[in-house]
């Protein structure tokens, strides 16, 4: 999996059968380096990242996201939703969304368009997800069907909270 963080990337390669971690690395961008340029630099220098993988995931780690109920979600209205929450989209960003099965939740977020194109050249079947989508799914897997469960995900400068009750998400926020 590849995790795009604000100042670089984290990479984890694991065996799909044993789940054993084979490779892990973090790459921090230099001050004048774009994420796309950083991606090209790291894949040029590291042959492990150019292998064929059974599955590949790009995890977007961004504070700019929001949740919307599936009952009112329309994919054609992504730009309007974004305008309501953040006023503007960056010139090199594309709005994406994850529908979280059986929850009634859609996570809307943006990705760096140039970076996504570069990564897709190496991994044409890569699956892109926002970290909040993964955390909600992870929390639901851990939650029992009855009672309330609180999951807190800590980061260097922030945290995410996912609260579930009776197997359903109640709150998911940063």
Task: Give the positions of each predicted feature.
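Short glycine-rich phosphate-binding loop at a beta-alpha junction
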Residues: 50-64
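Surface-exposed loop/turn elements that mediate protein-protein interactions on large endomembrane-trafficking
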Residues: 18-22, 73-76, 124-127
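Small-residue (GG/TT-enriched) beta-loop-alpha framework at ligand/catalytic clefts
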Residues: 3, 8-9, 98-174
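N-terminal phosphate-binding loop and adjacent alpha-helix
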Residues: 23-51
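Internal amphipathic helical hairpin motif
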Residues: 36-45, 60-103
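Short glycine-rich, Thr/Ser-proximal phosphate-binding strand/loop in the N-terminal lobe
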Residues: 6-34, 166-174
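Short, conserved beta-strand segments within well-ordered enzyme catalytic domains
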Residues: 1-3, 10-12, 57-59
